Amino acid sequence: MDIKSRTPFGIWFVLFLLLVTPFAGLSPFAFDSDESIVELTPQSVGDSVNARAQTTWSGTVSVTSTYTVSVFDELIISPCTNIEMGSGARIYIEGRLTIEGTIACPVTLISSTGSDHDGIQFNSSSNNRGSILNNLSIEDSIYGVTMYGANPIIHNLTILNPDRVGIDMFSSSSPLIYDLVINQAGRVLPFQGDWRYGLGLSIGSGSTPLVDGAIFTDHLTRAINIWGGSGGVLRNLVMSNISGSSWAISAGVWVEDSQPLLLNLSVDRSDHGIVVRHIDDSGYTRAVFRDCTVSNSMYRGVYVDKENHSNYTNYETADFTNLTVRGTGGEGAKTPNIAFAAIDVNSTGAWFENTLVDNSTSTGVRLYYADSSTTFRNLTIRDSGDPGQGPHKAGLAITWIFTSAPVFDGLEISGSVGHGIHSYKAEWQGSDLYLHNNSENGMFLDYSSVQIEGSVLENNSLSGLHMLDNIDTQLTNFTVQYNGFGGTTDEEKAGMFFDRSKTVTHPQLDVECFTCTVTHSAGSGILIRDSADLWLSDIVLAENDPNHAPFDVDNSGLTLGQQGGVINIDGLDIHTERSGASGTPAVNISQAAARIHSLTMSGNHSGIEWDGQNHNDYSSEISNSNFSGTGCVSLTNHLDLSGSGNTVSPSCSGTIQLINSQVNWSALTDLALASTVLQLDSNSDLHLHQPVNVDLNQSYPTIASGATVDVAYDITVWVVNNNTNGIPRANVDVSFSQFEPVMQDLTNTLGYLSLPNFIGQRWTNTGSSSYTVATISCGYDSVSNSTTVTIDQDRFVNCVLPLENQAPFLMWATPVDLGVFISQGPVEFNASDSWDLDDDELTFTWTSDLDGDIVASCTGQGQGNGQGITQQDMTNGVPFTVNTNYLNMGCQLSDGIHVITLEVCDDAGHCVSESRTIELVNQAPTIVFDVTPAMTPWSELVIP
């Protein structure tokens, strides 16, 4: 908008135009009543001129200030018309505008003075009046086309160098726009006093256009700016070089508090590719994108956020399907290497499906204060990350998420300059993850809580998985292989590294790995340091580095008295082949408590080396495991190590060595080719319960003075009467000739008493003791008997008591004591499990303190009725139900509080009775209702 100096002739010419302008409409054509079309060839149009019913422009037309097409009028602009606009001039459309430009001969709207004009404005009165704009070019305007509640149809519109906005929509405008081109919005500005410069297409205040085909090039602020509850459908969009504003975020697409649909979109070389921001909570934001490509953005490819980052009531504000983001912060960007993230989601929710992030100089995807309203499905991140920038080194950076978990379903990350995933203080869920060929760890979880189902982590330079200070983590179906070959420390070389993962015992928040296979690591398969309450199940470690223990634990760094816990292992299969003359253990545990179930080891190794010293004196266990290796088993500093079902395999060529340990094993089986030698130092004791094929004759010379090996067995006592019926609650006393104290107990309801794990023999460095002799005495109702057994194996003792006829045993099932039933409701009476030691017939009497004999209240013959029983059946103990109103048999029980007494007698006259209290009462109704969505714990219904 250059201001040029004027010659005197020019000044007189302008004055002449001002004088003659009021008479411009007095053309002879204006007085021709038969001709409704006025042609202006050329014509100068000033402030006071209004269009008549129908006006046609052609040739060159000059608009010096404003021109208005009244509400019932139409302005037609012919092909090749050149409209010269004065400074600030604007054409107002309140009626109909028809532009008949062609591709070969478009209509042009240009500045005539060197100062920018205000273009065309459609007011709301023009809505539905059929305005059509074909092949129009607008140059050097402040605004190109402005709409207030209008809906023109536009084909092939080109807008060059608009200062503020190319197309500006307000008040629920709904135009149809086809083949739009806007270039250099905001690029030639004399000054800028606010942010609203350099916008290509602005859709606001509830507007809903259809845009099919648009090209935006070289804009200052935004190519597409959507705000104020607007929507519409925009497709086949291309934009490039949207950059440079210091007043507002520059972006190819900006969506604010709106709900548009954008299809087939390409954004190249912009400050930000796509920005979706929620600001006003009185409305909602939901932008939908399909088939979008964003390339060479300077800061972010896609940015989805909320203006108030402390408002955590997130919901899904953006939906992307088939999104590609390439080259963020790369050489193709306006300024390389200053990017924040290729995709950035901050304090809000979004849906991403089929997303590719490629070659970003910062992290590929960053989540900050997101939650379960964010989902990524089929996300691929390649060759991304910013070296030396913490979480931004990673392909995926997830930080500060603890409200609810975002979801990743199908995720592949490769070529990151740092970790594949860096998670810090974050909660999230994932499935079907493939993390490979990353420059550091495949996955680094720092103080995070995750649930991941199905992952492959391979060919990462450092560990496949590094978990630091993790809590409440469940990993399922993991395959971790060929990791750590770029590492220099044992921690970096491990396949999976648990690093201070939950350092204190807690009934919840455990760290778990279920069905995890770790192979071909540069170091250990699983490396654990200072971690407690781990749960490892169905673990396979194979072909990891032979110079490292495949399973390696060291908890020596935990704080005494404050930290510690137990590592839980259920199913650990190890195959390894050592190298060199010195053996490497398959399992190496140092200063840690553990519960190990189902451990198997194969290959060439030295077995198990386990130092059980731990900071809080936790006990340990190893059960159902196979011992093998050249060293077999070495146990040190175990205060209490238990177990059962362990087997010494034929491949065990070493010893079972105990140093300063107390070990109690049941059912240890020795299948070694030669009897396995047990070695105990003077501070150790071994208790073997029911050992199988364990020959201690080979071991006692290696038992140090003061150490013991006890061999123990079980005793089962069955106390019966003359009818071979087990006697419940019979007294059993057992005394032992050595080692064990006297004990006393009662039999169970079937007359059995199990007495497990009593020492039958003790071995020391001098050999074995004699076998222990046990004396068993049983008694009931002043009748007793006794016998003796030698505890050299499991023993079963049948103790017979010749009793007199005994009272029956009353076993009352229903109704339970203090039961409450509805008024006149059914009540079942069942004591059919009652029985008699002498196999006598039993008689049952049911009595209520209110109604008397309950069975006597039953009326009817008991034939063909629903219960199919008689009063005699009830007396014999058959269960029955009152208040059922069967046609042929009715038993009644009135409302009120009843004391029910049951007496059971045998035919010898021995009786036993019991009383219970029940109540039949007319109760208030119970209201049960379901609410969707579910209410909060405070019974609040929150509707999003």
Regions found by a protein language model. Name each.
Residues 25-448, 453-531, 535-624, 628-635, ...:
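Beta-strand/loop edge motif enriched in small/polar residues
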Residues 672, 691-695, 761-788:
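A short, solvent-exposed loop/turn motif at the edges and junctions
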Residues 726, 736-766, 787:
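Short, acidic Ser/Thr/Gly-rich low-complexity loop/linker segments typical of extracellular
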Residues 786-806:
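Extracellular beta-sheet/turn segments enriched in Thr/Pro/Gly and aliphatic residues
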Residues 805-809, 842, 925-926:
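Proline-centered linker/hinge motifs at extracellular inter-domain junctions
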Residues 817-825, 933-943:
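Short, solvent-exposed loop/linker segments at the N-terminal edge
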Residues 830-838, 944:
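Acidic, Ser/Thr
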